[in-house]
Amino acid sequence: MKQFIDFIPLLLFFIVYKLDPRPMEVAGHSFEFGGIYSATAMLIISSLVVYGALFLRQRKLKKGQWLTLIACLVFGGLTLTFHSETFLKWKAPVVNWLFALGFAGSHFIGDRVLIKRIMGHALTLPDAIWSRLNLAWIAFFLFCGAANLFVAFTFQDFWVDFKVFGSLGMTVIFLVAQGVYLSRHLHDDPSTSKPKD
């Protein structure tokens, strides 16, 4: 359910983007609704509403949610200010690479890698497995960032579809692969440091 809530702004962005632009008037102001700029405005507004509601309910947001919200406001704001979708195309790569940087930094900062801090309360695994899993997440975020960047600037008519459904598909595939990998190690002795091949 929480993952679906995070997906709402992106889904609304996609729906508005796919609409044929049509003139509208609100409070005496006329504008065109539909297309990339209306979709960007919808992304910003819906992100503020969704994460604002989550913050009021939980009194906090996860660091990843803060990063996503700030990136949406910055890159979405630049897109609308300069009327250039180039800024928005950089949002997904930058966010993914910042996530990769955060996961990588946890190998050197603190006593636990980031994936263990996130999932350690639910799973008991040897540290070597946690380390390998953390490296897999780093590789995943680096790949997603590169894939988003490549599609955004190579396939102009397809990048929004990929941003929504391609990224979602890659995440699902990665999570399934992670589940299969973890199933092999759930009964490992946490005191051991040598992972299975």
UniProtKB/Swiss-Prot annotation:
It is found in: Cell inner membrane. GO terms for cellular component: plasma membrane. The keyword Transferase does not apply. Keywords: Cell inner membrane, Cell membrane, Membrane, Transmembrane, Transmembrane helix. The chain crosses the membrane at residues 36-56, 64-84, 90-110, 135-155, 162-182. InterPro entries: YciB (IPR006008). It is a multi-pass membrane protein. Pfam families: IspA (PF04279). Plays a role in cell envelope biogenesis, maintenance of cell envelope integrity and membrane homeostasis. Belongs to the YciB family. This is Inner membrane-spanning protein YciB. It comes from Pseudomonas putida (strain GB-1). The gene is yciB.
